[in-house]
């Protein structure tokens, strides 16, 4: 058995980020195909066929063709172990994506050549920048007509505030797409017959493309002069991104991307948990960044997704749950290949394992071999939309409660129980989350319900240094207070003016829009 440092050095744990429809799920499929994890890369566009994308495993995702939960997939490639976290492609699921990005060491950004930098990409890059996450860029859909590649790179640099270092460069696009030129290897890789031609000055190119090759040579000369060259240190600091061009749906340009990625992407990095936790430490540490209910609808299971930060996990280990102060025996854990699960024999730093959860584990929980650590930077955000749950059949109240509690544990929606009355209020970042909640409550828990408007503008978690001040605030504002799903007290403001006035009246109370788990 190899030591922890050796195993950690093999790992590459990363997420793919993009705006919806940039080709993220298709690229995911191709990466898994290259890693030997799947036999057939099923195009997502064939949704009516059985070849649904491997990473979109939930029924609703297969129907709508968007990723709404984060899947975890492990696969080997060139003596490395890659852990790929697929993030939701829909904007309403930004919290799930944010937490996923806390569990990775680098990210792969996908951009559509026709659309350039889009809104969702900007939001995700803001999150990556907060953690100086190294970014690799794949500019997709070169088989279709799009914008000038130079213009798109300028946009990436100005809007996303990261320097670009092209590694491959497109030769034409759309119907005139001939292939890519690899700037480091001085190779032309042809699109149609996949031939590799060594050297941009090779006479073979003049034979094949007499009317185009001179223009390519001129353009690549300009690109070499005007763009940054790849600098590993700047990349690891999150300041520079290597850029690759290709067509994911045609399986072109991906091998070049993957070959370089496993060489340059960082192995598991140190983590802040009150002290610096290094990946090569012998003792096990890890944190929960996601909870998913009903990955197997037949067994009503809940899985806590845990990122291993140091040491080694082995089945049967006793782990210390820092929040509760209790030891928990973990008889077995799960590794993931999208929905296909297998029991983990062992897990090393950088790996993601699934622990069966019966309601005792929450997002942000740290597990160690006895040390009290708190991994920082796993937040909750105040929801932006609120709805009251209306149950069709009052006899299903118990099932509704169980369903809401389990689904809200996952973190895409948040549950609030007002101190007065018997309402259930659900908060979310976007309207799609309510659709997903209603769909899953019906499919997985047999509960039919609707969500109707409620007079809540926003929620703020409340706390105070002085316990008596908090009790006074609670006594005077009971009708606007609620417990959230973790047992934290929240103020549900009916209007913006009300929130501002309440904050003025109660200067001793902290009103928090985000809070660390």
Curated annotation (Swiss-Prot):
The keyword tRNA processing does not apply. One of its GO terms (biological process) is regulation of translational termination. It is found in: Cytoplasm. One of its GO terms (molecular function) is GTP binding. One of its GO terms (cellular component) is cytosol. It comes from the Bacteria. Its main location: cytoplasm. Residues 9-269 form the tr-type G domain. Pfam families: EF-G_D2, GTP_EFTU, RF3_C. Gene3D superfamilies: P-loop containing nucleotide triphosphate hydrolases (3.40.50.300), Peptide chain release factor 3, domain III (3.30.70.3280). The keyword Methyltransferase does not apply. Coiled coil: none annotated. Keywords: Cytoplasm, GTP-binding, Nucleotide-binding, Protein biosynthesis. GTP binds at residues 18-25, 86-90, 140-143. Belongs to the TRAFAC class translation factor GTPase superfamily. Classic translation factor GTPase family. PrfC subfamily. PANTHER family: PEPTIDE CHAIN RELEASE FACTOR RF3. Increases the formation of ribosomal termination complexes and stimulates activities of RF-1 and RF-2. It binds guanine nucleotides and has strong preference for UGA stop codons. It may interact directly with the ribosome. The stimulation of RF-1 and RF-2 is significantly reduced by GTP and GDP, but not by GMP. HAMAP family: Rel_fac_3. This is Peptide chain release factor 3.
């Amino acid at each position: 058995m190899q030591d922890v440092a050796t195993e950690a050095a093999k790992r590459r744990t990363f997420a793919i980020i993009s705006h919806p429809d940039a080709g993220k799920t298709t690229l995911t499929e191709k990466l898994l195909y290259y890693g030997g994890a799947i036999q057939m890369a099923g195009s997502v566009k064939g949704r009516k066929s059985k070849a649904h994308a491997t990473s979109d495993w939930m029924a609703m995702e297969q129907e709508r063709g968007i990723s709404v939960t984060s899947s975890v997939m492990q696969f080997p490639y060139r003596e490395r172990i890659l852990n790929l976290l697929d993030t939701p492609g829909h904007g309403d699921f930004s919290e799930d994506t944010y937490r996923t990005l806390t569990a990775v060491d680098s990210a792969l950004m996908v951009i559509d050549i026709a659309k350039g930098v889009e809104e969702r990409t900007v939001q995700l890059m803001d999150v990556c920048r907060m953690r100086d996450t190294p970014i690799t860029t794949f500019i997709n859909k070169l088989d279709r007509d799009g914008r000038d590649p130079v213009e798109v790179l300028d946009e990436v640099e100005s809007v996303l505030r990261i320097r670009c270092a092209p590694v491959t460069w497109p030769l034409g696009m759309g119907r005139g797409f001939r292939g890519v030129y690899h700037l480091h290897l001085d190779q032309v890789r042809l699109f149609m017959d996949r031939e590799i031609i060594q050297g941009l000055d090779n006479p073979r190119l003049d034979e094949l493309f007499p009317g185009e090759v001179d223009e390519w040579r001129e353009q690549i000369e300009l690109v070499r002069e005007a763009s940054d060259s790849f600098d590993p240190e700047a990349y690891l600091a999150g300041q520079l991104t290597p850029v690759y061009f290709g067509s994911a749906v045609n399986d072109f340009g991906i091998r070049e991307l993957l070959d370089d990625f496993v060489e340059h992407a960082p192995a598991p990095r140190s983590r802040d948990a009150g002290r610096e936790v290094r990946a090569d430490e012998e003792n096990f540490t890890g944190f929960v960044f996601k909870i998913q209910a009903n990955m197997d609808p037949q067994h009503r299971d809940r899985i806590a997704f845990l990122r291993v930060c140091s040491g080694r996990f082995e089945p049967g280990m006793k782990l210390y749950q820092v929040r509760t102060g209790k030891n928990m025996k973990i008889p077995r854990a799960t590794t993931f290949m999208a929905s296909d699960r297998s029991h983990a024999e062992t897990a090393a730093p950088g790996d993601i394992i699934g622990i069966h959860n019966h309601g005792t584990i929450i997002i942000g929980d740290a597990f160690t071999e006895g040390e009290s650590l708190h991994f920082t930077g796993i937040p909750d955000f105040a929801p932006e939309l609120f709805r009251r749950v209306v149950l069709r059949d009052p006899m299903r109240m118990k099932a509704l409660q169980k369903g809401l509690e389990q689904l809200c544990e996952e973190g895409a929606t948040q549950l609030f129980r007002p101190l007065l009355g018997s309402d259930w209020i659900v908060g979310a970042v976007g309207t799609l989350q309510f659709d997903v909640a209603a769909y899953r409550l019906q499919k997985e828990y047999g509960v039919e319900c609707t969500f109707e408007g409620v007079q809540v503008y926003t929620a703020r978690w409340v706390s105070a240094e002085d316990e008596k001040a908090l009790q006074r605030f609670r006594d005077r504002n009971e009708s606007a207070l609620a417990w959230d799903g973790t047992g934290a007290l929240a103020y549900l403001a009916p209007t913006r003016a009300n929130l501002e006035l309440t904050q003025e009246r109660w200067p001793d109370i902290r009103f928090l829009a985000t809070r660390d788990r």
